[in-house]
């Protein structure tokens, strides 16, 4: 049974049926589809479009279908065009001809737009929860490991920071991601139900009622836009892509830090894998997969942008292609956030190796220049002097703080005994606004 066909003389080919069917993936929307139908039926009865007893029969049938799906009694499979057909046909089979009144005053165009908005809202809230869990772990692990470490520019050691402060930089990124998602939720929080195919309905549909019942702020203002809007899907996948970019950056650093060349951290066994030939290997595959899956979400974004780029108003079947990219991007970002939270919460930090790396990198060179500025030298001149000292230290395989005062005075008479306290790593990180890094 199809939900259409009266104006056709010939049967749809089996090839076209298979090509046209979306049940294999839009079955994910069964809960949202039934929830939307329940709201629609209640509104129809309130508006005296269907009778009260008809409403009760339809609601009972819908609730039974939902229960049977949840319990695995009713499998979402078979020769159905989509999830909407599956629900409606099973409803008619269950309660009889009264089930045919379910679709009164509604099109699959506003129905699927509603389903996707409801699913997008729920999915975004799930992503936000995963972000919060990761942010909590970043704070916790940072507070437990507030050790001095090198900060980098161009992947070259630059200045002293702390492990905690470094993790907090990612906390800020994910906090912005959370704000972006919440903003997207506010924008999409308008119900398309009641828009019909594209031009509303001749029935006195109460769109405000269904919008409120389904948790939306208001109904959409324009029917055409209501059924053809997929901006929110593009926007959400775009925001998921930014989250993945942040996760990929963090993954890259964890991969580097866990390598034998750095040895800053150890990634827990639970989030590592081994080699089939090299017994000694412990590979950071969790972080590497997150880094790799970033491109997958970017691909989902490009895919949906390309689908929508030339579509005239209003609904077009091309829009069926919005679902798989969104489902994939949502599932990917959630799994990556969960794995990253696991990696962060179980990693071990090597305090000694962090400090060794600090001492090898002339990370107090800027502070040494600031010292000379405080003694009256212009910064550009101080910059040149310290650069010459660095060359001298490299030739001697020494650090600035290991030079004698006599050696330092070869470069400037402004150096005094207090230079050593000024460029001490633990002391310098608590000077000026560096105190905001919170090292103690």
Swiss-Prot record:
One of its GO terms (molecular function) is argininosuccinate lyase activity. It is an enzyme of class 4 (lyase). It is found in: Cytoplasm. One of its GO terms (cellular component) is cytosol. The keyword Amino-acid biosynthesis applies. It comes from the Bacteria. InterPro entries: Arg_succ_lyase_C, Argininosuccinate_lyase, Fumarase/histidase_N, Fumarate_lyase_CS, Fumarate_lyase_fam, Fumarate_lyase_N, L-Aspartase-like. Keywords: Amino-acid biosynthesis, Arginine biosynthesis, Cytoplasm, Lyase. Its EC number is 4.3.2.1. It holds the Pfam family Lyase_1. GO terms for biological process: arginine biosynthetic process via ornithine; L-arginine biosynthetic process. Pathway: Amino-acid biosynthesis; L-arginine biosynthesis; L-arginine from L-ornithine and carbamoyl phosphate: step 3/3. It catalyses: 2-(N(omega)-L-arginino)succinate = fumarate + L-arginine. Belongs to the lyase 1 family. Argininosuccinate lyase subfamily. This is Argininosuccinate lyase. It comes from Clostridium botulinum (strain Okra / Type B1).
